[in-house]
Amino acid sequence: MEEEKIILPDNAFRELKEGEKYEPVMSPQRTYAEVNGWSVTWGVLMAMLFSAAAAYLGLKVGQVFEAAIPIAIIAVGVSTAAKRKDGLAENVIIQSIGACSGAVVAGAIFTLPAIYILQAKYPEMSASFMKIFISSLLGGIIGILFLIPFRKYFVSDMHGKYPFPEATATTQVLVSGQKGGSQAKPLLIAGLVGGLYDFIVATFGWWNENFTTRFCALGEDIAEKAKLVFKVNTGAAVFGLGYIIGLKYAFIICLGSLAVWWVIVPGMALIFGDQVLNQWDPTVTTAVGAMSPEEIFRCYGKSIGIGGIAMAGIIGIIKSWGIIKSAVSLATKEMKGKGGDAKVQVRTQRDISFKVIAIGTIITIAITFLFFWWGVMEGNLLFAVVAILLVAVIAFLFTTVAANAIAIVGSNPVSGMTLMTLILASVVMVAVGLKGTGGMVAALIMGGVVCTALSMAGSFVTDLKIGYWLGTTPKKQETWKFLGTLVSAATVGGVMMLLNETYGFASGQLAAPQANAMAAVIDPLMNGIGAPWLLYAIGAVIAIVLTVFKVPALAFALGMFIPMELNIPLLVGGAINWYVTTRSKNEDVNKERGEKGNLIASGFIAGGALMGVVSALLRFGGVVFDYESWWASPLSEILSLVAYILLIVYFIRATKLAK
């Protein structure tokens, strides 16, 4: 099959008519060299590389980028260069194994760093590499096993009904064979530019990583008196993230951020000026009016965001209840009908048999139970039984929510669902008698397993849809996904420990916003102090009101919770996306520029994140440049703004090259 002839059928993205069948790009009647030394080696390499990059970026800014598109571009680039015969078939497997990186990373870094964060307060708490590795691995395996019975429902039965934005983009890259080879060049150049830019800041500190209105006396005055401050992170990777997220989603995230920073924070200083609000946290001894905007945000604003995220997760389950029922009944029918159906299935409809899935699920849950019993609960049978029941039920219920979210908007509200899991796990574990630091570690490991399972389910449904469009054998994707999970779990465990040793999660140099939220939620619950339920309730009410007005509540709540300096760059990137894709009167030119922008943004993200890992490795090895006193100077922030403007100008000029 020649690369040039590879095109998607015209019914790939629309609903099928009565009696119409979807014929994938690769014929179901032919056998292709999908799994071989080439595809497995590159897949494992991509899983390692992007796990390290995604873990660094996720812990630094709280956003995990989906690696599917950059991996697909690299796969197409290397297979074109090597003139591979069955390049398309191999590339789907490379992408499928490699894409485990983002899924496992999101699961691990949203929860497990909370153990390190709480360690500063409770030195007796500890997390070994094995605990991080095993919880990530088991969570990933559970996610894969729980999703396979729903493959046919999401991928085939709902064909054309769900947009699958990320799967669509990745499929287009894989299909564009020749074009994909040329796409690798701008991606690599952008990776070098973004990587060098972020490396200079992280390693040498030539300019500050943030620009704030505190750089001048007037701004400092406004921050202290009116509690109003503006901040923006000037990094290349976060800017690229904003471009890919797009203006609409970035705008809603920033609205949430500004609602907290410019309405709630100054509002609280005005209303409760001379009061010490420490009902939830006895360590707070300062009156609200005497706090800095940052302190008010940390003590009160974030909790409102947490309430919003949790409620958005509940709303997600309610909305998805019909899907859960349909998918479960379909899976049950498949299981019952499997034995009597002696027909050999067509290659593109072949899954791992339901018998194997059922046995695999039982074994995995049994191993998870043993891990909880001996590795986490120190031999307490009751705690281990309660823990495994909670994890299995929550992971199963939320699996379809995660897959549905990815199918519709391409983003997985995993942090909100995990936050709910943690609150539920903490309340239940305290009720059965597990409290204190042991309870915290247990609940966080449980949260880590659930979070990785949900993250994996969402990511995997993307892979399976790509395979469906292109004609891959689902069984091969499903089987080799386990290897990618193993590699990614080992990599993320190593990177997390490296970053903790280098920077320390409690230092403030790693935002790790989700893990900080988990730590903030779990600490009071496990110590009997009680949580700031009133603040959670305010956030929950905001989420309900937003849902009524059809505003994406999760995006808004995430903005309320993630620090402002990491939200504003998303808006900058989103605005540049809008600018680049609307400049020309010719729609085709706009579309081409937008796609070129996606490539450059992907390069910024991958390059910036990978060089961030290199910078952390250098620091770990003792190569440290002291730039703290320089960063305290307003000039470093002004220079930061100049560098940022130059980066944006470069980005816009680079997209213009697509004529």
Could you tell me what each predicted segment is?
Residues 1-659:
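Alpha-helical multipass membrane-protein architecture
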